[in-house]
């Protein structure tokens, strides 16, 4: 998106500039859907993206369907956010792919899928969002990492998740310092085992002694509340917030 295109969209969306706006990827289910609801409950407008996502009857929620690993989708998301609401205050890079298998079993297609969504999706959309935030001198980016970036588990080999989610954690710290003096905060949350379609309840019996120290798996609401805490903590940047029931601290 060029500067001229951005200015044109801004002029057409002048009425929406007062309301804070969150862009959330992977917004159709699990943590993403919880975040859409959580930000709306706080009065934010939301632009939600997913590969498949239904339009919302709520005028404060706009959905953009598409593969976030593709630059064209990232551009469509930003065009929609600015065109409809005039700004982006917070970007939550929630879309992600997790695939557990032995390292030597990963295929070229697996690699392309995981790195495309986990890294490419972050890269293309965050570039565009920060460009808009720099024009206004404020903004917040939240990345979703994972405990596998800090703690390997032989029962669930996931080198590509560690590679990509660990990269997001490192990029979080780097961007936080790069843009701290320009009004933009960058943080991450690192969820442990959360009850989502990716980790259904019938899989918990196999956890055994891998159950988090708090004695339960996390809920979507636990992650949502952690991200909303970061939203309300203006002095926090470069933070990797572990929402894992003590997994990292306890091992």
Feature map (PLM): residue ranges:
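Short C-terminal tail/terminal secondary-structure segment
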Residues: 2-12, 237-251
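Conserved glycine-rich cofactor-binding loop
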Residues: 28-29
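Conserved NAD(P)H cofactor-binding loop of Rossmann-fold oxidoreductase domains
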Residues: 94-99, 245-246
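Substrate-binding pocket helix/loop in short-chain dehydrogenase/reductase
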Residues: 102-103, 110-112, 207-208
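C-terminal substrate-recognition "lid" of short-chain dehydrogenase/reductases
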Residues: 123, 184, 219-243, 248
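Active-site helix of classical SDR
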Residues: 126, 164, 172
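Alpha-helical segment proximal to the catalytic Tyr-Lys
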Residues: 131, 177-181
């Amino acid at each position: 998106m060029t500067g001229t295109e951005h200015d044109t969209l801004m002029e057409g969306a002048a009425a929406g500039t007062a309301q804070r706006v969150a862009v959330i990827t992977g917004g159709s289910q699990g943590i993403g859907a919880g975040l859409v609801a959580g930000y709306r409950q706080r009065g934010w407008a939301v632009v939600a993206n997913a590969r498949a996502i239904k339009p919302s009857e709520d005028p404060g929620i706009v959905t953009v369907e598409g593969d976030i690993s593709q630059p064209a989708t990232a551009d469509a998301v930003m065009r929609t956010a600015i065109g409809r609401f005039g700004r982006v205050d917070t970007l939550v890079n929630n879309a992600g792919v997790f695939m557990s298998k032995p390292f030597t079993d990963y295929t070229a297609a697996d690699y392309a899928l995981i790195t495309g969504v986990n890294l490419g999706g972050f890269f293309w959309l965050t570039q565009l969002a920060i460009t808009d935030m720099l024009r206004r001198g404020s903004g917040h980016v939240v990345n979703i990492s994972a405990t596998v970036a800090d703690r390997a588990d032989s029962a669930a080999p996931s080198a590509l998740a560690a590679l990509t989610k660990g990269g997001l954690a490192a990029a979080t710290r780097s961007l936080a310092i790069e843009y701290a003096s320009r009004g933009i905060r960058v943080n991450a949350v690192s969820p442990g085992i959360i009850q989502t379609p990716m980790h259904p309840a019938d899989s918990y019996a196999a956890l055994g002694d891998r159950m988090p120290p708090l004695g339960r798996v996390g809920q979507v609401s636990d992650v949502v509340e952690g991200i909303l805490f970061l939203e309300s903590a203006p002095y926090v940047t470069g933070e990797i917030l572990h929402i894992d029931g003590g997994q990292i601290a306890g091992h």
